[in-house]
Amino acid sequence: MSSQAPENTPSTKGLFGLFCLASYLLSLSYGTTFLLALMLGSHGGSESDAGTVISVAMLSTFLAVIFSGHLTDIIGAPRAIAAGGLTLMIACIGFAMTPTYGPALLIFGLILGFGWGVFYTLGPIIVAMIIEPARRVKYFALLSGSMMSGIGTGPLAGRGAVAMGYPVESAFVVAAAASLLGAVVFFLIAPKIRLQQAVLGPVAVCRITTGAAARVIRSKAFFPIVMVGLGGAIFGGLSSFQTSYAALHHLDYSLFFLGFMCAAISCRLLIAGFIVKRDAYLSSCVLTSLMIVSILMFVFSVESPFSYLLAAIILGVGYGLTYSVINGLAANEAPNGLTAQSLLLFSLSYFVGVFGFPLLAGKIIVAYGMPSLLYTILSVSLLNGCIALGRLAWRKVAVAAIA
């Protein structure tokens, strides 16, 4: 009973609200990377160049995921995220000042990857530290909804800037200012988060070791970790080159981000509480099927603004809720004492997909065209669906064998 009391106080709710606000502000920086293809294209670059800049961030995210736990043990997770926010600010300023492809842009991509990796990894771990397992999925949904709001706002800021006569680079300036503000908020709320952790119990060690990683991989948590990587590839592949897809079909790319963002956020904030009470295996199976339906629409039936918006909404529902469900599975199916390590590997897998896949995606577009990329993404989504369906079927077989 005492473990829940602190979470229901107005001060705690206000703290979590500030936590989500700061997360929203930092997330704008990643959202603006979806404008790189548009920005580079206007300066003689290609989708392959944009994919290279995005994917180079994967290298620094590896370091961020591996060392974020050690950094947390030294200065605490909130201050580590604040430091990551400052690197996001530097990266966005660099993107705004370097609109052409070259070594400088790759360096800023590396800087972005480190900052985003620290933030994205430690955010859920803070939730896991201060929320008991029975309530984690709900709070993961609230956090991820805030982050998705920021991610979606990034490209919309670019569309708004262009509509007002400003260059698309203006969106990166806005994201830099938001990152600075988010970093300040995280620094200011760090003492309150530390106090909340002290009230609820000792903080788990966040260091990742080879032995801990091996134990997590041998557990059931391995499957949601793989699924989030595949889901990240789907999301990264579609979002990073949505400006190119929209131009090819004479559509406004802001419709995709608006539809996707509104659907994902609404589902995570309004429906996630209902989904939490359902069978997680069945839910992941149904939701991955929605993602497949959406991609089929992008391949075969998007011909008008309405169908474009509808496909984005269906993708937002499927992806938005699937992420929340498997994030909870990665935490709750982890071996005893290794929840934080499982979430670190979960984040690492996500980064491999969301940052690594655009490198391949950009080369596919340049060499074979957008349709080939869509078929590749469809194949990835089918594999993801097979894993979800296989887990559900295997459990039924296991239950029948026991009975």
Tell me the role of every PLM-derived stretch.
Residues 64-76, 267-280, 365:
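Helix-to-loop junctions at the C-terminal end of transmembrane segments
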Residues 171-187, 374-389:
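Symmetry-related core transmembrane helices of the 12-TM Major Facilitator Superfamily/SLC fold
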Residues 110-145:
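Cytoplasmic helix-loop-helix junction between adjacent transmembrane helices
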Residues 104-118, 307-321:
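Hydrophobic core of transmembrane alpha-helices in multi-pass small-molecule transporters
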Residues 31, 58-66, 151-152, 261-269, ...:
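Residue-level signature of mid-helix packing/kink "hotspots" within the transmembrane helices
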Residues 79-93, 282-296:
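Structural signature of the two symmetry-related core transmembrane helices
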Residues 2-13, 193-225:
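Juxtamembrane intracellular "pre-TM" segments in multi-pass secondary transporters
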Residues 9-58, 223, 227, 232-245, ...:
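Helix-loop boundary and gating motifs at the non-cytosolic
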